[in-house]
Amino acid sequence: MRRIVFHQNGFGDLLVCFKALYAIKCLYPKDKLVLAQKGFSDENFLENIPFIDEIYTGDKNFENLKSDIFITNIRNSSFFKTLHKLKLGRIITQPHLLSLLYFDTPMPYKRAKLHMSEIALKLVRAIDKRHYDTNFSKINFKEVKNLLPSDDTLSEKFFKQNKQFSKIIALNIFGNQTENIGFNLLPKTWLDLSKNLSEKFPEILFILVNFTHNTLQFNIKEKENLKVFVNSDSIASLVAFCNRLDGLISVDTGIVHLCDILQIPSLIFIPKHTFYRFSGGSYGGKCEKFSLENGYQKNYAKIMQIFYKKANHFTTRIKNENSI
């Protein structure tokens, strides 16, 4: 039995790699799959995913993992210099000047217009190309959503307190990565959008999503079909909540990738440079994208009118669908 280590940090970035993790376990069920990560705070969630055998949290002492194959989706020259000094068995990385010198890399390598989940799968293929090509079509990635831990304690209480509606659409306006680079709408814009949608579609429940650890909390007057859901730090709780949704309107952030796995239809406000890499739709669900270049704020009012129309069109489609 080999020890295959897959290394990826972050929350959303790690969720994008679930295809690769699931593929490794399906292709090599007798081997032990170890996830090495840093930044996904809910380790209990990861420990209860059946296709991951072991979790290592941190960015040091990789040699203690005793890997036979060490796969990393991190592409960084200083990190590669560190890896080169370690005894990790066979190392598979994304192409880079240093990785081409020291490690195994997927070649030929074309990633233009590929979703990051597909790029991560290239690393899995590099383990054994023939075995991968022969058996990859047998993997049903839509099954991943049924393997995620789920805890409906919070969501069950929330939905019991509210009237039943024909459809449920969540709006997620916060995202750490997008806020760091200034690529997000103003909070007031999001709140105005949620109010406008709730007035135009009274038969749909609109939910503003927030988290207990967020320093910014909503202070709005809730209506019958406009509510606020505040999740705990539990990702299993977020899974249960998202499973109740018929649609998601969100800035590009981790919940987008979770709803991608769950195949929830989504409308994503996303930077143009990540249009292909980090959006939804990679598991077969429907994803609409509203992408803009940096500097879009110069024409903010006009662009917001276009986004509002897009959100209305998305909501109309969700309303008219008999099943999602």
Place the predicted regions along the sequence by residue.
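Catalytic machinery of carbohydrate-active enzymes
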Residues: 1-324
